[in-house]
């Protein structure tokens, strides 16, 4: 589940397929943080 801001089929924000994997991993970690905050209702 990556950001939909991109032209990649998977929806990741990578410029090239090489960077797609890195961007996807970074996005997943970021999403996990948001999910944890959401469960704790912080903010």
Curated annotation (Swiss-Prot):
GO biological process, one term: neuron projection morphogenesis
Family matches, as InterPro entries: Cystine-knot_cytokine (IPR029034), Nerve_growth_factor-like (IPR020408), Nerve_growth_factor-rel (IPR002072), Nerve_growth_factor_CS (IPR019846)
GO molecular function, one term: nerve growth factor receptor binding
Alphabetic keyword roster: Growth factor, Secreted
Family: Belongs to the NGF-beta family.
UniProt organism field: Macrovipera lebetinus (Levantine viper)
Protein name: Neurotrophic factor BDNF
Locations listed in the record: Secreted
Function per UniProt: Promotes the survival of neuronal populations that are all located either in the central nervous system or directly connected to it.
A GO-annotated cellular component: extracellular space
Superkingdom of this protein's organism: Eukaryota
């Amino acid at each position: 589940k990556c950001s939909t801001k991109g032209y990649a089929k998977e929806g990741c924000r990578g410029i090239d397929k090489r960077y797609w994997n890195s961007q996807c991993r970074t996005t997943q970690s970021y999403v996990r943080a948001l999910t944890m905050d959401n469960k704790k209702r912080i903010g």
